[in-house]
Regions:
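Conserved AMP-binding loop of ANL adenylate-forming enzymes
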Residues: 4-34, 42-45, 99
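Active-site glycine/GP-rich loop and adjacent strand/helix microenvironment
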Residues: 34-188
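Conserved ATP-dependent adenylate/AMP-binding module captured primarily in the ANL superfamily
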Residues: 1-12, 52-62
Length: 188
């Protein structure tokens, strides 16, 4: 449901550049393909200036509808293209960025390079709470069906810690889990 805000649809061709280990060797294979979902998985660990042309060729050959990518990897690709006076040649319907911080100015840069909407979301491996930008807003909204979210007391800068209770792990639930992540609450 989160990705649908960026136009994601069932059977969309998805390319991922995230923490997928495709090969443990530095010069190893960067690509894995999941035929059951029609997903092209590329290793974020091998993403270097020397190997970016391989990534670009693989993406152009695959022609994904969406790119699910760490913000740092997306910025690395965008900055490479700018430095080498190249354009992004694979039409995308959206770029899905999560698991790392992406500022609004960085988001604007990515939207300029990829020529599509970039959707940011917040979550973590513990799967306690999830938040994403709104359909028509760049404010983040927590998903109430994913986990129960609370906020700690504001610090001197007005930041509050995200505290959550998961709805996903009933065998060993995390209750009032202090994430160590801080947010500034806004009035939508």
């Amino acid at each position: 449901a989160n990705w649908r805000r960026a136009g994601y649809f069932d059977k969309a061709r998805l390319a991922l550049i995230r923490g997928h280990v495709t090969d443990s060797r530095a010069k190893g294979n960067i690509i894995a393909y999941d035929a059951t979902r029609d997903w092209l998985m590329l290793s974020s660990y091998h993403l270097t200036d020397e190997r970016i042309p391989e990534y670009l060729k693989a993406l152009e050959n695959f022609q994904p509808d969406f790119l699910n990518i760490y913000p740092s990897s997306a910025l690395q690709l965008a900055e490479y293209l700018q430095r080498h006076d190249q354009r992004w040649r694979t039409p995308l319907q959206g770029v899905l960025c999560g698991s790392e911080q992406l500022t609004l100015s960085q988001k604007r840069l990515l939207e300029g390079v990829f020529q599509c909407r970039v959707l940011r979301w917040y979550g973590h491996a513990e799967r306690v709470v999830l938040a994403a930008e709104g359909t028509y807003s760049e404010l983040f909204y927590f998903w109430p069906h994913y986990g129960f979210v609370e906020f700690g007391e504001p610090d001197a800068d007005g930041l509050q810690e995200v505290i959550g209770t998961t709805f996903h792990n009933m065998a060993m639930p995390l209750v009032r889990y202090q994430t160590g992540d801080f947010v500034r609450l806004a009035k939508p």
